[in-house]
Design a protein with these regions (language model features):
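Short amphipathic alpha-helices within nucleic acid-binding modules
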Residues: 430-432
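Residues at or immediately flanking beta-strands
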Residues: 149, 211, 400, 448-450
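Short amphipathic alpha-helix segments
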Residues: 355-372, 395-402
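Acidic, glycine-enriched active-site microenvironments
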Residues: 436
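Intrinsic disorder/low-complexity segments
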Residues: 170-176, 371-398
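Conserved short beta-strand edge segments in small beta-sheet-based binding/regulatory domains
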Residues: 371, 440-455
Length: 459
C-alpha cells in the first residue's frame, strides 16, 4: 500500500472487528493508526455507531487525529424509515393470550399473506427450547464438560452444548422414556423458546403456500446453505424468513414490508455492560430490513420491558434516547469509553493450579500499579475491587483491579476459567504493565493465560 489515500470501515460497530484470539487487536484501531501513518482519511460507516466512535467525535480528537461526525438522517431516494410498534407482552398475557405472537404481529402477518409480501422475524435463540427442567426437583441438565445449560433441539431429540458442541440424546416429557438425570422423574419439561419452536408455530399458523424459512447456526452448517436459503426467500412469492442475529443486517429485499422481533428482552439482560448497546444495534439493524422498496415498512417489537431506553430509542429511531442513559451509566460505573478495560483470562483442567496462577498474576498487577491490597478470590464478577475502594475521580488517575473471580462461564471444555478485569485511565500503557506483571507471575503446567487489552468479551 504505497499510496494509500482513503480507508473505509463499513458497519464499524460490529464486534467481529475485535479479534478475540491471538493476535488480539481491533481493526478500527489498526485502521486509525494506518491512516495517521499515511496521512489519509478514515471513514467509519454505521447506522448504529459504537460508543467509542461517538465519544471520540464528541471530544473532537483522539490520539492526535481529528474526529468528526457526519449524519444522514433520511434514507436515500424516496424510501422512509419504517414505523415501529411496541407490543407489550404483559398486556397480552393479562388479556388471556398465550400465543408466541402478539395480536399486532398476528394482524401484520395476516396482512403480509393477504398482499403476498414478505416478512422477516428475529428470534436470537436457536434450538427448540432454551433448556429442559425437571418439574419435580428443579434440575436443569448441564454439559458434562462446561458449566452451561444444554439447549434442546426437537429435530434430533438432543440436548446440545453451544459452548463446546457436545450432544446428548434425550426424551422430554410427555414422550416415552423421559427421565430427569438427577431424580428420575419423567416430568422433564421444555422451557424457553428457540427458533425451531417458532418455526413450527409459524407453519401451523400460515397457509401452506407461504414459505417459512429458518436461518440460524443449525440450518446453515453445510457449505452454501446460507446463500441457498436466501435464494429460496428471494424466489418465493410470499415468505417469512425467521432467524437469529445473522439476518439482522446485509439483507436488501424490497418485498419485505414487515419485521417482527419475537422477544427483544433476551438481548437486553445479558451480564455485560455493552448489553444495551448491542441490543440497540441488533434491533435497529433488523428494523432497517423493512420498507426498503416502494411499499412502506412496519416493525413490531414484542417485549415485557416497553419502557426500557433501548426500546424507546428504536421506536423513535433516535439513538440519543438510549445513548444519554447508557453513557451516564458507563460514566458512573467507570466503563469504556471513559476508561480502558483489560481482561486477563486464566484457564486449565486443574482448578487449583489455575486458581493459584490467577492469584499470583493479581498480586503482580498490584505491585505493577502500586496498589497494596491483598488479593482475594471473589465468588462473582465485579463484587468489588479486591478490597480497595476508589471513587470515580480517583480512578481517572490510577488503575483499578477487579477480581480475580471465576468467569461467568466458570468451566468450558473441561477447563476451569478465572479472570481479572483491569480498569485504567485513558492513555495508560496497559499493554506494557500487563505484560510485565504476567511475565513476573510465571507459568503453571497445563494452565493457559490470555491478555485482552480493550476487551469486548468478559464472559
Amino acid at each position: 500500500l504505497a499510496d494509500l489515500g482513503l480507508i473505509v470501515i463499513d458497519e464499524e460497530h460490529e464486534q467481529s472487528y475485535k479479534q478475540g484470539s491471538s493476535p488480539r487487536y481491533h481493526a478500527r484501531e489498526v485502521a486509525a493508526k494506518l491512516a495517521r501513518l499515511h496521512g489519509c482519511a478514515l471513514v467509519l460507516g454505521s447506522a448504529t455507531p459504537s460508543a467509542e466512535a461517538l465519544a471520540r467525535c464528541e471530544t473532537g480528537s483522539h490520539d492526535g487525529a481529528r474526529w468528526t461526525r457526519v449524519e444522514m438522517p433520511e434514507r436515500p431516494g424516496t424510501a422512509c424509515l419504517p414505523e415501529v410498534i411496541v407490543a407489550d407482552l404483559r398486556r397480552e398475557f393479562v388479556s388471556g393470550s398465550r400465543s408466541i405472537f402478539s395480536k399486532p404481529l398476528l394482524d401484520a402477518l395476516d396482512e403480509v399473506v393477504e398482499k403476498r409480501q414478505k416478512a422477516v422475524l428475529l428470534h436470537n435463540r436457536r434450538g427448540f427450547a432454551s433448556f429442559l427442567m425437571c418439574r419435580e426437583c428443579g434440575c436443569v441438565p448441564t454439559c458434562k464438560h462446561c458449566s452451561t445449560a444444554l439447549t434442546y433441539h426437537e429435530r434430533t431429540h438432543t440436548l446440545e452444548c453451544h459452548t463446546c458442541g457436545s450432544s446428548y440424546r434425550v426424551r422430554p416429557y410427555p414422550e416415552y422414556g423421559s427421565a430427569c438425570p438427577k431424580c428420575g422423574s419423567r416430568y422433564l419439561a421444555k422451557m424457553g423458546l428457540g427458533t425451531q419452536q417458532v418455526e413450527d408455530a409459524l407453519r401451523a399458523l400460515l397457509p401452506e403456500d407461504v414459505a417459512v424459512i429458518r436461518m440460524d447456526a443449525d440450518s446453515t452448517r453445510t457449505k452454501g446453505a446460507h446463500q441457498k436459503l436466501l435464494e429460496q426467500f428471494d424466489a418465493a412469492e410470499c415468505a417469512v424468513l425467521l432467524g437469529t442475529q445473522m439476518i439482522a443486517k446485509g439483507l436488501d429485499f424490497p418485498e419485505v414490508t414487515l419485521v417482527g422481533v419475537i422477544n427483544a428482552d433476551y438481548a437486553l439482560k445479558m451480564p455485560d455492560f455493552r448489553a444495551g448497546e448491542r441490543a440497540f444495534d441488533l434491533l435497529e439493524q433488523v428494523a432497517g430490513r423493512a420498507g426498503r422498496g416502494e411499499d412502506p415498512g412496519r416493525v413490531i417489537i414484542q417485549t415485557y420491558l416497553p419502557d426500557e431506553p433501548v426500546i424507546r430509542a428504536v421506536k423513535m429511531h433516535d439513538r440519543s434516547v438510549f445513548t444519554e442513559h447508557d453513557l451516564d451509566m458507563r460514566r458512573e460505573a467507570l466503563y469504556p469509553p471513559y476508561v480502558r478495560l483489560a481482561n486477563v483470562l486464566v484457564w486449565g483442567r486443574d482448578e487449583r493450579a489455575a486458581r493459584g496462577l490467577v492469584m499470583r498474576i493479581a498480586e503482580e498487577l498490584r505491585v505493577e500499579f502500586g496498589l497494596d491490597a491483598t488479593p482475594m478470590l471473589h465468588p462473582a464478577v465485579e463484587t468489588g475491587s479486591a478490597g480497595v475502594e476508589f471513587s470515580s475521580r480517583e480512578l481517572l488517575s490510577r488503575p483499578q483491579i477487579l477480581g480475580p473471580t471465576p468467569c461467568v462461564i466458570e468451566r468450558a471444555k473441561d477447563r476451569y476459567r478465572f479472570h481479572i478485569i483491569v480498569k485504567a485511565p485513558l492513555g495508560c500503557d496497559l499493554s506494557g504493565a500487563l505484560s510485565a506483571a504476567v511475565s513476573r507471575a510465571g507459568t503453571r503446567p497445563g494452565v493457559s493465560i490470555a491478555v485482552d487489552v480493550d476487551a469486548y468479551d468478559l464472559m
